[in-house]
Amino acid sequence: MSLLQIYWRALQYLAAYRLKVSLVVAANIILAVITIAEPILFGWIIDAISSGKPDKDILFLWGGFGIFNTIAFVLVAREADRLAHGRRASLLTEAFGRIISMPLSWHHQRGTSNALHTLLRASETLFGLWLEFMRTHLATAVALVLLVPTAFSMDVRLTLVLIVLGLIYVAIGKMVMDKTKDGQASVESHYHTVFSHVSDTISNVSVVHSYNRIQAETSALKTFTSKLLDAQYPVLDWWAIASGLNRIASTASMLIILIIGTMLVQSGELRVGDVIAFIGFANLLIARLDQMRQFSTQIFEARAKLEDFYVLEDSVQDRDEPVGNRDLKSVRGDVEFRHVSFDFANTTQGVKDVSFTVKAGQTIAIVGPTGAGKTTLINLLQRVHEPQQGQILIDGADISTITRQSLRNSIATVFQDAGILNRSIADNIRIGRENATDEDIVKAAEAAAATDFIESRLSGFDTDVGERGNRLSGGERQRIAIARAILKDAPILVLDEATSALDVETEERVKSAIDRLRQNRTTFIIAHRLSTVREADQVLFLDHGRIVEMGGYDELSAKGGRFAALLHTSGLLNDDDKTAVKVG
């Protein structure tokens, strides 16, 4: 994208505030016009003083312009600040909502820390552009456009000096941007690397401590920051050179104006006040050119950040619900997969031509080796991914025609990784049903056998669980997740090895709660511990994304196939009678 395209798209984010932004910009343009009048008035004052006939009216007018300009600038700047801050806050909220709505495959491919870093840096960059647009960008352009003809009307020769000064500024800026284009892109790449390393290390700090990686990870970060500085320094050097060249040009221009102006005053072609006015014009021009240079630097440095953000924004635009999708209501729980296929990009993993039917209220266990596609099936059911072929139906309705919100309201999931947020225990359980009362939360916790450890905490249900629930044990986190699913009370239940983190005694208590929860609900059990699938009405054995075996527990146990072999390996199939031993 060109710099102009990047800038124009940045301004399009202000569309919702169009009226207020237009008023602020218009006010700044008026202020820019007033600043051009000030040097002229000051020149008149000097002429009046030189002639020995000071004009009080002009003096008061000049002072009034200055006071008005100052007060108006403060008010306009205040409004511009509020608009820019407000738009940044709304942008963060909007982009955050779109990002978290994306499928897991998008997050795995993009990287959560990368998306977060891109969003945060872009929001700060856009904030700076919006603020300067409202404060200076258009005002600077208008001031420069008006300054030249005004100066021409006073003296062509001195005006040419100002024009040459402007051309020098433009040439220097163009040269530096050409020299630093690749370097600035490299700087942004290194920033992403640094942020990703910090985020990755801190999120896995327990591993870092366990394997004594503190020094190694710190050294790695030092290496990354050194590479960042190696890329940053040449860019900074070029802009420092540009600043020096601009200062030389502005000083030389002022000197030339004074020399030529003195000669013209001596020859009687100009008054002293005219020269003073031109010096004011020169100072004004230099200030505006400096603003242009800062704008050029700003948009140039923003280029890599915003290009990455625009790619991010474009990639999340397609998650809007298709027009015409309807809500899923009065769900019985009949589920059917019809020749469903889905492949992950650049891998051999996924599911291939999967077909099965689950009647309302039945329990189906999905087993198989790691990477067989068990979790993928459940993600397809919840429209985390969309099938590339085939259909998934609930109560006879293709879920691709159902709104995601109503679909997911009908499914309660207990993940193997409990998914605990950095909030209170009550807040984590309330995720199951936002409008749940405190009494509802307590009942759900009791059903999940969680009240014992909750009540042992000083703050009880108000206990802050820490980041990812790190102040709780694995079993405690899992029981909160089960309580959340109980509270949701959805007609379809998904258990992703829900008791895997529990000890034997707690597992028995939770199993009773889960058995009650499964009643009159369609239940999917993703099983790694095969002792949990005994009571399933139907068992699917997946391997490499395909259904290898399907049938009842006892049927598959006696069949002597892949499922029976897995039971035998797990110690759940007796060699003498080849029957499953009920565990628990």
Swiss-Prot record:
This protein's record includes keyword Translocase: yes
Subcellular location: Cell inner membrane
Binding site for ATP: 368-375
Pfam families: ABC_membrane (PF00664), ABC_tran (PF00005)
UniProt-recorded Gene Ontology molecular function terms: ABC-type beta-glucan transporter activity; ABC-type oligopeptide transporter activity; ATP binding; ATP hydrolysis activity
SMART domains, per the entry: AAA (SM00382)
EC number, UniProt record: 7.5.2.3
InterPro entries reported for this sequence: AAA+_ATPase (IPR003593), ABC1_TM_dom (IPR011527), ABC1_TM_sf (IPR036640), ABC_transporter-like_ATP-bd (IPR003439), ABC_transporter-like_CS (IPR017871), NdvA (IPR005896), P-loop_NTPase (IPR027417), Type_1_exporter (IPR039421)
Ranges for domain ABC transporter: 335-569
Record's bilayer topology term: Multi-pass membrane protein
PROSITE patterns per the UniProt record, alphabetical: ABC_TM1F (PS50929), ABC_TRANSPORTER_1 (PS00211), ABC_TRANSPORTER_2 (PS50893), NDVA (PS51317)
Catalytic reaction list: [(1->2)-beta-D-glucosyl](n)(in) + ATP + H2O = [(1->2)-beta-D-glucosyl](n)(out) + ADP + phosphate + H(+)
Annotated TM spans: 29-49, 57-77, 136-156, 158-178, 248-268, 272-292
Record SUPFAM superfamilies: ABC transporter transmembrane region, P-loop containing nucleoside triphosphate hydrolases
GO CC annotation: plasma membrane
Occurrences of domain ABC transmembrane type-1 (ranges): 21-301
Keywords: ATP-binding, Cell inner membrane, Cell membrane, Membrane, Nucleotide-binding, Sugar transport, Translocase, Transmembrane, Transmembrane helix, Transport
Main subcellular location of this protein, as a coarse class: membrane
The protein's assembly and partners: Homodimer.
Role, per record: Involved in beta-(1-->2)glucan export. Transmembrane domains (TMD) form a pore in the inner membrane and the ATP-binding domain (NBD) is responsible for energy generation.
Entry's free-text remark on domains: In NdvA the ATP-binding domain (NBD) and the transmembrane domain (TMD) are fused.
Family (UniProt): Belongs to the ABC transporter superfamily. Beta-(1-->2)glucan exporter (TC 3.A.1.108.1) family.
Protein's UniProt name: Beta-(1-->2)glucan export ATP-binding/permease protein NdvA
Organismal lineage: Bacteria, Pseudomonadati, Pseudomonadota, Alphaproteobacteria, Hyphomicrobiales
Underlying gene: ndvA
